[in-house]
């Protein structure tokens, strides 16, 4: 479009000079970073408009750095240097700053200067989508003090207690921290400074053994991943919270109070490692869920079907959700046969001895079981659910099962005459994205790998 406008009339007039600057700025704002930079050479009017046009900087839209032109510069710093030049050449606002393939290696001080600059220039989205280890512990404190910021996603950065206590991101609605270093006190301060927060994603944040989310009255989605040493998750006074996702291990004390809209929880991981980074698990850590959560309608569990201890935990977990309607159970059994410890093996009459569970008797309508390989123990658990779930409408099993095995399951006793059995082969799961999960009424009813995020 810009190239067409630049074509002179038959009289040699510059048609671009006739256009208002607001229109030129609008044209530039609709182009990618590289295209906009190339367009400004067409006319001095475009160059003038460029200076006042908001810069949407996405490194996927930048040309690949030329190799070999400057031998003294390491190749991994070339893209970071291009980012520095782009910010320096454009004095206007920078509403979008998104990095997917830029490493801070050798340029940490430059990255920290970017963060200060972005906070001062009205950034609305700052997303470091590159590999977390590429961020090299850059300090990101200034971003939490940005009053214009709406979306913040950090990789392996640092947030100091002083920076977190100065958080004043009044418009921030989405915060993602991946392998970021932050203290428990710093997390509390950061949350207090983000009153509009709707989504909080914590992935392997260093320095935290207790996650406490209190008085986050706008929070809708909380994600917690990869915390083998996590001792406690506490959610209090979160009236809008609807989903708690991640791989939440039962070795943590889980307390949820004041979250009346919480309807989806998972994955709750029943298989508990008995060591933490080579050390014996501290006494009293295996605490699990503290009190019933009646609002939850959708629950996802990760379990080893072949282990009696795991199944006891999984069944006891069901008792905390008296109004559960949909249950997802994903196997974490190895793909190879393991000789079971006879003291921890599922015996033939194990499920017959289980006491009645309220949600199975009255409310459970949908069950989805998944296992990457044939697992006899999973079939026994499926038979248990079919025999106990009186209002079951639908059960889907994703596994490699023979026709004979499917027929045996169909012939098992079913407490619900309306129950429908569906068998599927195992499907590859896609990488986790917020967009994919929030688009589903049931966040576990899709091909997104929530457990492996």
Which residues make up each language-model segment?
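C-terminal capping region of solenoid repeat domains
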Residues: 1-8, 275-283, 298-300, 325-328, ...
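Leucine-rich repeat
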Residues: 2-206, 212-216, ...
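C-terminal per-repeat helix/turn "cap" of leucine-rich repeat
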Residues: 45, 142, 165-168, 187-190, ...
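Conserved hydrophobic beta-strand positions in leucine-rich repeat
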Residues: 55-58, 95-100, 124-129, 150-155, ...
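Extracellular beta-strand scaffolds
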Residues: 125, 159-160, 182-183, 203, ...
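Extended repeat-based solenoid scaffolds, especially LRR ectodomains
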Residues: 252-308, 320-323
